[in-house]
């Protein structure tokens, strides 16, 4: 039975471990991580399904996103708590017209007419708009759902802070394949200097009267089951996880300009975390190695998670067959 190790327990790590377990049935899969849900970067995410802060080949991103959407629909069909309402519609307003190819996987896509734009635009820079329907995941219950399935199927979970990837087998014994799903941690774990943090600060608020998401060039209001996520910042190469009250206030006030009814919102909490950014997603097996990398998803970890997990399964099969491969296009 092949012994598989997955490093990292955010949505990418847990999904990858579960996908391997389900598709390579004789495998023994172990997740090793320092932090687990609800204390991962994934848990802070709003969970809207659309590529965000992810610089990669668009066809590759679309393929991964389609797999994730199919997965979400399966999750919804199982009747999981809150899953029945995991579609939402809203507006994306822009200062410069952009109709990216990934919109083809969204539903009800409509370019706003001049009159429609006037009805929703709140700033002079809102010169172009798109309405569409997408999906979202509440990350914490979803990761729990996956983790429960993983454990029920015989998966193992170990709590450990691994400093270097070479230390894994010193502490836990030999593995046939080791997958790096450590997000920003890959910078230190394997010395990948192309991984860098993009600092994101958000607010969680309650405002039941808001029924649509709203995104513009800088700010966004995204609906969750019981709250709304207001953002945001995207500060590249910033490691500071300290909440800045002035930034929180600006996020709130600027979103109120876009959605005036937010002024009655109840502020629940503020959060800061570091998106694991990279020039391109690294999803590949190192040549002549047992190590596979699956990291650098930027702000799109939720959007891409299941597509990337399925691709990892194929890479694991190649490594086990003695044919490590590279999945770059």
UniProtKB/Swiss-Prot annotation:
Glycosylation: residue positions: 39, 180, 224
Enzyme class: oxidoreductase
Biological process annotations from GO: D-amino acid catabolic process; digestion
Binding residue positions for FAD: 9-11, 34-35, 40-42, 46-48, 161-162, 182, 275, 298-299, 301-303
Gene Ontology terms, MF aspect: D-amino-acid oxidase activity; FAD binding; glycine oxidase activity
Positions that bind D-serine: 220, 275, 299
Catalysed reaction equations from the record: a D-alpha-amino acid + O2 + H2O = a 2-oxocarboxylate + H2O2 + NH4(+); D-alanine + O2 + H2O = pyruvate + H2O2 + NH4(+); D-methionine + O2 + H2O = 4-methylsulfanyl-2-oxobutanoate + H2O2 + NH4(+); D-asparagine + O2 + H2O = 2-oxosuccinamate + H2O2 + NH4(+)
Segment forming the signal sequence: 1-19
Keyword Flavoprotein: yes
Obligatory cofactor(s): FAD
Chief localisation class: other
Disulfide partners: none
EC numbers for this chain: 1.4.3.3
InterPro entries per record: DAO, FAD-dep_OxRdtase
Sequence motif: Microbody targeting signal, positions: 327-329
Residues binding D-proline: 220, 275, 299
Listed GO CC annotations: cytoplasm; peroxisomal matrix
Role summary: Catalyzes the oxidative deamination of D-amino acids with broad substrate specificity. Could be responsible for the degradation of diet-derived D-alanine in the intestine. May play a role in egg-laying events and early development.
Family (UniProt): Belongs to the DAMOX/DASOX family.
Quaternary assembly: Homodimer.
Protein name, entry field: D-amino-acid oxidase
Source organism per UniProt: Caenorhabditis briggsae
Gene name as annotated: daao-1
